[in-house]
Amino acid sequence: MESSKSPSEVEKSSSASPAPQKPMIRVSKQWVVPPRPKPGRKPALDALGRRKAPIKPRPGPTSALSVEEAKFRVREKQYQDTIGKLQKENNELLEQLEMLQAQLKNSTLDSPKEVEVNSEVVKPDSATTENENRYVNQYNYPVEPPCAKNAVYTEIPIELDPHAFLGDSAKRIRVDSDSKDAKSVPSENGRIRVSMSPQNEINFTPENPAVMEKIRKRGVCNSVEGCLYSGSPKSVKRVRESEETKVYAQLLIDLHKSSKSAPMLKAGPSIAFKLPTMEPNFNDVRPVTSISSSS
């Protein structure tokens, strides 16, 4: 009976005799079976991988300070680099400035001799300078024209400019409606003076010395082209003209219009003007008596 024992009984008897062993976890090829959790608790799983989420340590105050210090050091290094570059450029510019100052001193010391030599060798051409002066005088006008005391010259027609005053040679114009024949008498300076009658004298010369001083300084001003022969701009307000000046200007304008509208009278056939010839005319030669016969 003892020999006929089942193998299960033999195993039980053999296993009961040694020390108890820990249970072993069998590993499969595809997955690992985790141990059974304690009752009443759920494991912290990640929603994406269905695995346990790792717990990251929170950054403490020491780590934040270390990051700020690293950034500050980087910025400080950049600033130091830029300061070094600027100092280097400043030194180079100072050296260039010293070199240029030395060259300028040398050139100022040597320039008077060169100028004297060049002035002796090179001489301006008189013909070219005359042509240039002629061209400049043709298109440039003086600020104060060289004229008589009471003479003012303008480029505007005198009948349209109420501020234009005649000079010493033509101070007065006499107008007489009764006289028909007018005689023109040449004046000393070459201008024509019309003398008809002592009645209705019109004096175009300002007698006020203050007005003459303003004319000399500012020139003749009008509303069309500003102040002629003066450096004052157009925005400067000109002096108000008196009532006499307005009357004189209107009279001149009326005279000009009436001269244009007057009919032209034909006095006869026109005489062609011929230049005088220098050839001798033998018809006008008079006989000359000899001295011997008279004696």
UniProtKB/Swiss-Prot annotation:
Compositionally biased tracts (Low complexity): 1-19
Glycosyltransferase is among the record's keywords: no
Record keywords: Coiled coil, Cytoplasm, Cytoskeleton, Nucleus, Transcription, Transcription regulation
Induction annotation: Expressed is under the control of the iton-regulatory transcription factor fep1. Expression is repressed under iron-replete conditions and induced under conditions of iron starvation.
Pfam family, one: Hap4_Hap_bind
Motif Nuclear export signal per record, residues: 93-100
UniProt function note: Component of the transcription regulatory CCAAT-binding complex. Required for the reprogramming of the cell for iron use. Down-regulates pcl1, sdh4, and isa1 underlow-iron conditions.
Name by which UniProt lists this protein: CCAAT-binding factor complex subunit php4
Gene name in the database record: php4
